Amino acid sequence: FKNHAIGVVPIDEDGNVILVGQYRFPHAAYSWEIPEGGGPAGSTILESAQRELREECGVTARNWLEVVGMDLSNSVTNEKGTAFLAWDLSHGAAQPEDDEQLHVVRVPFREALERVKRGEIRDSLSVAAILRVALMSLQGELLEPLRGLIRV
């Protein structure tokens, strides 16, 4: 697979995560997910994640931590995915692609986790990234600036 799937769990200063809603044609359904997209050859995974966060949400982050790498569906494709945790956010104007109609919301991290548990967030990279961050929180693996922000 030529692109590498990337996702970002952006955490703001109040412990909210930014989610993106959009219609996904392959499933003929609306989907809530973390900001994500494809990283083309020639750019690093981190550069692609930074670009997607900026384009979809108008957000840049000072700090980044890779939290999960995965095979997205190894019985059907060789596409790989990587997700990052991003914090120390700055906000600007979103720059979605012409064919993207996105709805961007902020919810407490715990609410995003509940949406995963209820099956409202179904995208595999989003589910894996949110659950990984929750596990890091439960196991005391979050970096100091995030410990008080991410509540599970």
Whereabouts are the PLM-identified features?
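The catalytic Nudix box helix
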Residues: 34-66, 84, 96-98, 108
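Nudix hydrolase/Nudix homology domain
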Residues: 30, 75-76, 82, 99-152
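Active-site segment of metal-dependent pyrophosphate-handling enzymes
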Residues: 12, 24, 54, 58-92
